[in-house]
Amino acid sequence: MATSQQFLNPTLFKSLASSNKNSCTLCPSPFLQLKSASTIFNYKPLTSSSATIITRVAASSSDSGESITRETFHGLCFVLKDNIDTDQIIPAEYGTLIPSIPEDREKLGSFALNGLPKFYNERFVVPGEMKSKYSVIIGGDNFGCGSSREHAPVCLGAAGAKAVVAESYARIFFRNCVATGEIFPLESEVRICDECKTGDVVTIEHKEDGSSLLINHTTRKEYKLKPLGDAGPVIDAGGIFAYARKAGMIPSA
C-alpha cells in the first residue's frame, strides 16, 4: 500500500512519513464524535387509557389538550360493491392536483369516484358541483385496491364524505386513510352493501369502548362495526403528523 502511495505522489508520501516518523498517535476529528447511545427519548405511545379521544376540530384548532367524544355521522349513504380500486375512486389523470392547495383540493372533491363503471347509475358528485350530498360510503370486499394513491382518501374527504364502511379494505388504502386523517375506514362484520341502497338515511355512532354502530333509518336495521383500535385517535387528530404534534412526538409548526 505504501509503495503505491509513494508511486502516485512521492512528494506527499515523504512529507507524511517525515511528520509522523516519531509519532503514531492519531488526532481525533471533532466531526467523528458520536452522541451517546444511552440517550433516552420520551416518546408518547399511540394508545391511550382514556375512553374519550381528541376530535379533528380540537386537534387542529386548539393546543389545550381538551378531549371530547368522537362525533356521530349522519346523512345519506352511497352504496358500492366489491373491488373498488383507486382508479375508480380518483382517476390517475387528476394525480397532478396538490391537496394542500385549496383550489386543487376542491377540484379533487369534485372528481371523487369519477371513474366508476357506467352501471352505477348515480353519481357520487353531480357534474358541475364541488361537493357530494352523500356523507357515508358503503362498500364491499377489498375496497381501495390497486395502486397506492393518497389522493384517494383525500378526494373522498374533500367531497364531504365522513366515513367508508366496507366489508374489507386493501391495506394501502386503509393506511392512507389513517395517515391523512381524511376519512374513517370502518369495517363491517356482515355484508352491509347487499342490504343498503344509495340514498338510504344512515347514522354512524361511535361508542366509548371503541366500537361503532351503523343504523339504517330507511330499513330500520342496525349493524355492528369493528373497532378501529390504535388507528382511531390518529384519524381523530387529523392524520399522522397532526397526531404526532399533538402527542409531542414532533415540534408544533
Curated annotation (Swiss-Prot):
A Pfam family recorded for this sequence: Aconitase_C
GO cellular component, one term: chloroplast
Cross-referenced Gene3D superfamilies: Aconitase, domain 4
UniProt superkingdom: Eukaryota
Transit peptide (first-last residue): 1-56
GO molecular function, one term: 3-isopropylmalate dehydratase activity
Disulfide bond residue pairs: none
Record GO biological process: glucosinolate biosynthetic process; L-leucine biosynthetic process
Gene null: resulting phenotype: No visible phenotype under normal growth conditions.
Tissue: Expressed in vascular bundles of roots, cotyledons and rosette leaves. Expressed in stem vascular bundles which branche off into lateral inflorescences. Expressed in connective tissues in anthers. In hypocotyls, expressed in parenchyma cells surrounding the vasculature. In rosette leaves, expressed in phloem cells and cells close to the xylem along the vascular bundles. In roots of adult plants, expressed in cells closely associated with the stele. In flowering stalks, expressed in parenchyma cells associated with the phloem or the xylem.
Reactions catalysed, as given in the entry: (2R,3S)-3-isopropylmalate = (2S)-2-isopropylmalate; a 2-(omega-methylsulfanyl)alkylmalate = a 2-(omega-methylsulfanyl)alkylmaleate + H2O; 2-(3-methylsulfanyl)propylmalate = 2-(2-methylsulfanyl)propylmaleate + H2O; a 3-(omega-methylsulfanyl)alkylmalate = a 2-(omega-methylsulfanyl)alkylmaleate + H2O
This protein's record includes keyword Hydrolase: no
Known function: Catalyzes the isomerization between 2-isopropylmalate and 3-isopropylmalate, via the formation of 2-isopropylmaleate. Functions redundantly with LEUD1 in the methionine chain elongation pathway of aliphatic glucosinolate formation.
Known partners and oligomeric status: Heterodimer of the large LEUC/IIL1 subunit and the small LEUD (SSU1, SSU2 or SSU3) subunits.
Name of the protein: 3-isopropylmalate dehydratase small subunit 3
Lineage: Eukaryota, Viridiplantae, Streptophyta, Embryophyta, Tracheophyta
